[in-house]
From Swiss-Prot:
Catalytic activity annotation: 3-amino-2-oxopropyl phosphate + 1-deoxy-D-xylulose 5-phosphate = pyridoxine 5'-phosphate + phosphate + 2 H2O + H(+)
Gene behind this protein: pdxJ
Organism annotation: Parasynechococcus marenigrum (strain WH8102)
Ranges annotated as spanning the membrane: none
Compartments, record wording: Cytoplasm
Binding-site residues for 1-deoxy-D-xylulose 5-phosphate, renumbered to this chain: D9, H10, R45, H50, T100
Protein's UniProt name: Pyridoxine 5'-phosphate synthase
Length: 249
């Protein structure tokens, strides 16, 4: 059964839209945990467009579940991670012009630069996950980097038409199986919603789903604790679809 990591970046987005002090994402992380979140995820971007350094520092002190720090593979971010010591670091690609992360990290092309970063973090006892597309070449490179975890990019599945979703789901399912065969542990995330999460949650060996925007959007109507409860219920008990043999979207 997959666990739920709640990404609270979008709480910080609201704050930064007015360059003010509220809403503070730190107490919202506590509410997410009260709603059943198994972990809290934040992305400290190089441009600090939403989550700020003080958020990460305070979250490290207050999160009672697990703190997953998403960050670019840069020396600055590695130093921050070593100082904060989150429960996990997820290395992700970044482009300043993007609204949100647009694809997986090209580990195969960046292996020589990523490997020493992975090694340095893991030597300090910080598990490292690499956010990648479900491609064998990338997954093999992840294994070669020394990382023990991958987070499979689900954006293409989330953006696919109804007719194309089964094919995208099969690709991610095969990627998860390949990752496990390589000795990697598997998380997934990006673009998952209340409508499409169940098939991903039903993938064998899926350990954690990191979900943010849809939960924060739902929270506007029902509150964050209830929004988290609803998402966790879908992940824990995905319904089966008799047509495709996987969970209903």
């Amino acid at each position: 059964m997959a666990s739920l990591g709640v990404n609270i970046d979008h709480i910080a987005n609201i704050r930064q839209a007015r360059r003010t002090v509220e809403p503070d994402p730190v107490p919202f992380a506590m509410l997410a945990e009260l709603g059943g979140a198994d972990g809290i995820t934040v992305h400290l971007r190089e441009d600090r467009r939403h989550i700020q350094d003080r958020d990460v520092q305070l979250l490290r002190q207050t999160v009672r579940s697990r703190l997953n720090l998403e960050m670019a593979a840069t020396q600055e971010m590695v130093e921050i991670a070593l100082a904060v010591e989150p429960d996990m670091v997820t290395l992700v690609p970044e482009k300043r012009e993007e609204v949100t992360t647009e694809g997986g990290l090209d580990v195969a092309a960046q292996l020589s630069g990523l490997t020493p970063m992975v090694e340095r973090l893991q030597q300090r006892g910080i598990p490292v996950s690499l956010f990648v597309d479900a491609e064998t070449t990338q997954l093999e490179a992840c294994r070669n980097s020394g990382a023990h975890w991958v987070e499979l990019h689900t954006g293409t599945y989330a953006d696919a038409s109804w007719a194309d979703q089964p094919g995208q789901l099969a690709r991610i399912t095969e990627g998860a199986a390949t990752a496990r065969h390589l000795g990697l542990r598997v998380n997934a995330g990006h673009g998952l919603t209340y409508q499409n999460v169940e098939p991903i949650a039903a993938i064998p060996g899926m350990e954690e789903l990191n979900i943010g925007h849809t939960i924060v959007a739902r929270a506007v109507a029902v509150g964050l604790q209830q929004a988290v409860r609803e998402m966790k219920a879908l992940i824990q008990n995905p319904r089966l679809d008799p047509l495709f043999g996987h969970a209903l979207g």
